[in-house]
From Swiss-Prot:
Annotated compartments: Plastid, Chloroplast thylakoid membrane
Membrane topology (UniProt): Peripheral membrane protein
InterPro entries membership: PSI_Ycf3_assembly, TPR-like_helical_dom_sf, TPR_rpt, Ycf3/AcsC/BcsC/TPR_MFPF
The keyword Glycoprotein appears for this protein: no
GO BP annotations listed: photosynthesis
Protein name, UniProt field: Photosystem I assembly protein Ycf3
NCBIfam families xref list: PRK02603.1 (NF002725)
Known role: Essential for the assembly of the photosystem I (PSI) complex. May act as a chaperone-like factor to guide the assembly of the PSI subunits.
């Protein structure tokens, strides 16, 4: 049974009904419908913490999805799951792939910056300040891009950039 039919709460059920109506009304190809169904089911599984199921649905959604904008969000969500699972190298790969298709995803830049910042902190703990600075510099570049896309957001990152004198 598709996940969209087993969601338990009112909002999920309502969203599923609205999405199904829109899929019938809006002219879309069968591939687009299939991709959307997998994407929706992936989001539902992800919100419940079922990451393996979410990944499976997202991977399935990438097959029929040809629109680069829509595909970017699928790839971004795959990156989120890999981040949650501590698979930072894989997460960075998927954030990069999402940004190749849609360079206006500030949340992808932010998440990449967070991973780089984390790696910088890990390098400090290992006593490698040179590597740490390289990671922090990379984090700064990603945060600058996120802030440029959405001025006023990412206040903590903005403050970190100022405190560390990485903001120009």
């Amino acid at each position: 049974m598709p996940r969209s039919r087993i969601n338990g709460n009112f909002i999920d059920k309502t969203s599923s009904i609205v999405a199904n109506i829109l899929l019938r009304i809006i002219p879309t190809t069968s591939g687009e419908k299939k991709a959307f169904t997998y994407y929706r089911d992936g989001m539902s599984a992800q919100s419940e913490g079922n990451y393996a199921e979410a990944l499976q649905n997202y991977y399935e959604a990438t097959r029929p999805e040809i629109d680069p904008y829509d595909r970017s969000y699928i790839l971004y969500n795959i990156g989120l799951i890999h981040t949650s699972n501590g698979e930072h190298t894989k997460a960075l790969e998927y954030y990069f792939r999402a940004l190749e298709r849609n360079p206006f995803l500030p949340q992808a830049f932010n998440n990449m910056a967070v991973i780089c910042h984390y790696r910088g902190e890990q390098a400090i703990l290992q006593g490698d300040s040179e590597i740490a600075e390289a990671w922090f510099d990379q984090a700064a570049e990603y945060w600058k891009q996120a802030i440029a896309l959405t001025p006023g957001n990412y206040i903590e990152a903005h403050n970190w950039l100022k405190i560390t004198r990485r903001f120009e």
